[in-house]
């Protein structure tokens, strides 16, 4: 088995380089005989989302960072769990590495694990239905308002072509709105064939699954085209492939060829759309979008579209998840220390 494991602390996962450096430092210190790592793991038996851009997780992550390198604690990690990974091992765990003191590692892992159990249902922001969320965004007196569509997040395995929010924006005649990404390689190809500035009848989105909603049929203006585009995510670049922006009424829609979620502002700026100057910015993402959009958003609203990634994990059709586990089982108890 492994002697040292270091996990991301941040969600969005913008700390990949920092955690790699932490891991390397611990490995080198161990090889030099400077420390003797011992690990403890506490199993909370819960499925939950823990965005570290918001409280209470922001404060907790700052606390565990401050613990490292003091009083014999070498590393502290919280394995959030991937809620849509239907595997027996699903669930939140706390991992503590201490310098030769198993009891100290056990005690801290237990304390942090019990703290997370006490925060069941209290770490993720609320989500609204589509009409309510959009109405709240339109009523807000500043811009931009970022509307998150986590149910159709490609990062969680969704197709990223659900049209519920887009269709609602079109129906209510929304202005100064942009939305993306919608994964539709065929529509992108048609836009390139037609050319920048063309007006064409286009059917797009709503193709892949029953949860995708209905395709949008509209007369669109092609307002942006870019080959082999990318968007940022922390220090990395995420390829989106060929992409096109089409305008339907007052809504600009980003269509992409490579299925991925919204992470960087470049998703829009690649195509001449400045999301900082739009009233409503709809992003298909759960929380990774916050790395770039959080600092510019005047307000962030989560809505629940008809996409397949249910925020209420009791509605996820798990087959392999080991039971009992909260919230599938309301009375699930933490397993406690597993090593």
What are these regions (language model features)?
Residues 1-35, 42-55:
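Internal gly/pro-rich beta-alpha loop/helix module
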Residues 2-4, 70-71, 168-178, 276, ...:
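Structural alpha-beta junctions
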Residues 3, 145, 279:
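Conserved acidic residues
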Residues 9-12, 204-206, 306-308:
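Short, acidic/turn-prone active-site loops that include or flank metal/cofactor-
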Residues 11-18, 185-187, 289-290:
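Short gly/pro/ser/thr-enriched loop/turn and capping motifs at secondary-structure boundaries
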Residues 32-74, 89, 299-301, 305-339:
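Flexible inter-domain linker/hinge segments
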Residues 48-250, 254-255:
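Hard-cation-handling environments
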Residues 117, 230-339:
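Extended hydrophobic packing segments that form well-structured cores
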């Amino acid at each position: 088995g492994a002697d040292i494991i270091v996990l991301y602390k941040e969600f969005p996962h913008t700390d990949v380089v920092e955690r790699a450096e932490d891991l390397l430092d611990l490995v080198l210190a161990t090889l030099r005989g400077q420390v003797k790592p011992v690990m403890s793991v506490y199993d909370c038996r819960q499925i939950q989302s823990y965005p570290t851009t918001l409280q209470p997780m922001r404060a907790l992550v700052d606390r565990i960072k401050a613990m490292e390198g003091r009083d014999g604690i070498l590393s502290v990690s919280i394995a959030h769990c991937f809620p849509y990974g239907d595997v027996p091992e699903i669930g939140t765990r706390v991992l503590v590495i201490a310098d030769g003191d198993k009891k100290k590692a056990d005690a801290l892992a237990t304390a942090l694990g019990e703290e997370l159990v006490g925060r069941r249902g209290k770490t993720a922001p609320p989500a609204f239905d589509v009409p309510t969320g959009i109405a709240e965004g339109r009523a807000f007196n500043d811009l931009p308002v970022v509307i998150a569509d986590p149910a159709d997040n490609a990062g969680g395995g969704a197709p990223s072509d659900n049209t519920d929010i887009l269709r609602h924006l079109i129906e209510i005649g929304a202005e100064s709105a942009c939305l993306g990404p919608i994964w539709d390689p065929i529509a992108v190809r048609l836009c390139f064939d037609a050319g920048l500035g063309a007006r064409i009848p286009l059917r797009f989105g709503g193709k892949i699954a029953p949860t995708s909603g209905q395709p949008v049929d509209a007369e669109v203006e092609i307002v942006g085209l870019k080959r082999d585009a990318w968007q940022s995510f922390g220090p990395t670049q995420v390829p989106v492939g060929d992409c096109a922006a089409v305008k339907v009424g007052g809504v600009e829609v980003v269509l992409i060829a490579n299925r991925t979620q919204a992470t960087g502002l470049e998703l829009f700026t690649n195509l001449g759309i400045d999301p900082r100057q739009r009233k409503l910015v709809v992003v298909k993402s759960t929380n990774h979008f916050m790395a770039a959009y959080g600092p510019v958003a005047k307000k962030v609203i989560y809505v629940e579209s008809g996409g397949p990634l249910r925020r209420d994990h009791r509605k996820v059709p798990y087959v392999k998840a080991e039971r009992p586990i909260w919230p599938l089982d309301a009375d699930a108890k933490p397993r406690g220390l597993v090593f």
